[in-house]
């Protein structure tokens, strides 16, 4: 039911994404073998999730303003950004100080955070936001 403002839809996306990512964190982080790894801390997950949702909401507002079919365009942009968001995770071992000690399972978990956030955010913004009045 499309009845919310972008702001409310973004808040729903934010809460849903944070909850999903924290569930993933608490279930799977112990299996990664990574201790004291800031991206796998609750605060790190919350901060990076909030940044992603905030950025997506801004992009959706812009796309919605200028596109005749904002849902399709935003979904495509989101898919491209999701794939690009994997690059820092993939290259973390080479780029970060101490990254060579990062486990593959930790990197996969970071990618899972991106996917969960993207799915929830795209759904909330495109399905819950009221149509733009011209």
Enumerate the predicted regions with their spans.
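Non-cytosolic membrane-interface motifs at loop->transmembrane helix junctions
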Residues: 38-44, 99-112
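Membrane-water interface at the C-terminal end of transmembrane alpha helices
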Residues: 5-17, 115-134
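N-terminal signal-anchor transmembrane alpha-helix
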Residues: 1-31
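Alpha-helical transmembrane segments of multipass membrane proteins
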Residues: 16-25, 56, 60, 84-88, ...
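Membrane-helix boundary connector in multi-pass membrane proteins
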Residues: 89-108, 126
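Internal alpha-helical transmembrane segments of multi-pass membrane proteins
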Residues: 38, 61, 65-83
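Canonical alpha-helical transmembrane segments
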Residues: 50-66
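Alpha-helical transmembrane segments of multi-pass integral membrane proteins
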Residues: 12-13, 47-49
